[in-house]
Amino acid sequence: MAQRVQLTATVTENQLGQRLDQALAELFPDYSRSRIKEWILDQRVLVNGSIGDKPKGKVLGGEHIAIDVEIEEEARFQPQDIPLNIVYEDDDILVINKPRDLVVHPGAGNPDGTVLNALLHYYPPIADVPRAGIVHRLDKDTTGLMVVAKTIPAQTRLVESLQLREITREYEAVAIGHMTSGGTVEEPISRHPTKRTHMAVHPMGKPAVTHYRIMEHFRIHTRLRLRLETGRTHQIRVHMSHITHPLVGDQVYGGRPRPPKGASEEFITALRKFDRQALHATMLRLYHPITGIEMEWHAPIPQDMVELIEAMRADFEAHKDDIDWL
């Protein structure tokens, strides 16, 4: 059911020179800047009685604002008592270390049991923040650090920081193949043309940039540290598959087990039982959305990746005399 919302306000003199969408986000803090921008583009905002349809247009101060919109009532997700590993919290943000097998947001096939449901239980006021404060996501079986906004102003500023590439996200991963050097993958990503749940490199996709460097070599695998410039769905997984080095365990993008020649039964078993993409969000750095202070968090790789890497090291040591690139 749609709800009619009518809002009025006057731009203050202190807002002189601000963008229209920025000024309105301050005047109407109960609504996100992205939603206000949609209203502007939909010509639902009147500035001194005339349609204001340019989000980047500057305000002078003193303008009378009138907004008349209908808002579809959002689906009501239920709070659920799901444990969250919280590594930092203040009045404005949460940083969590997400485990494997946990979806971030409800969707097709996952109506509940998500990070969002857990947030609603842990901090009920977050229900008033768009998407319960979730500003970026990790795949279901990717582990590691995520920041969540507890208030609308914090959410607005974090979204802006992501768009401006001011938030640094670094990952650890294990890729298939012997990689000789680090590098950058700069290839656009879009939905796969025939597989609805897959992504793919495509010339008409959205820009995507992934930087990577080598941390450790194994016989036919490589441990990597990666940094995202952009945050497309499945970005690291798609980019590494595109350069023929899919992540270990990533059966969607070609990471099925490939034991090296002469591998022990123990190592073959370790590879086969690792049933998720070997990817962990290990570092998060950002400017606090309210105080502006630079903050940084680290999360060590989880036990399943520790055991995988230890098995690869043992295999490497057992066969290093036979490796021709040493």
Model-derived segments and spans:
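RNA pseudouridine synthases
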Residues: 2-326
